[in-house]
């Protein structure tokens, strides 16, 4: 953060990170971090005991966490049955949206945003309902049309804006479609190369007010380089190569991509922090640091 001039970070639960650890980081560094809640202990309980997973029980854990006042949102993604892949049980859109409704209700209760995961890193196999990382909605951003209509007062943020890794942009296009057609859907952009910013910034139904810069974990997603091609650089894991052992400088790469944009500084400031501060209701030292996005003249 000091290296790149980042004032504050929103912590999500990564591998081996826990809610308790994130809360401790927040407490130990006043004004530097806020944290999102993730259903971690119930998931571990299901894996340990073999009991049937339930969305209601997972939502109860999120409710208890948010009730502490230590968290500002829900993420990364929504809780899901950790044994889904092992069971080889298919789950359809209607069943999964019914599960997600439990988490959306908790978000509505506490007036916090949710994060909807879209994308995969390519280096390890995961499926719609197969494999250890089975996650049905991660391949289906268009489902958010229904969520946004059913829960118009809950802000939904697309993790990775449809591009977690690789050069493919199909899910990115679908995420743009949803964001442009709804008022409560936003896009996180940390793994976008520069050209991906062009369409949403030009779209009057998206614009800078719906984009949030952030990064993925970075510890094992290298940057690929293909000179003369589009994109010239992108993040991606290689399937036949072991995970890298150093800290990939994803932060520097990501900031370089957004730094190439020749847009008004106020718009850039919204993407780099103003939108996150607004959605997560983060207290700022001054009240007029960023444009007021509800003012169409701004």
Q: Language-model segments: what does each one mean?
A:
Residues 1, 9, 35, 74, ...:
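Divalent metal-coordination and catalytic microenvironments
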Residues 1-28, 296:
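An N-terminally biased module of ancient metal coordination in phosphate/nucleic-acid-related enzymes
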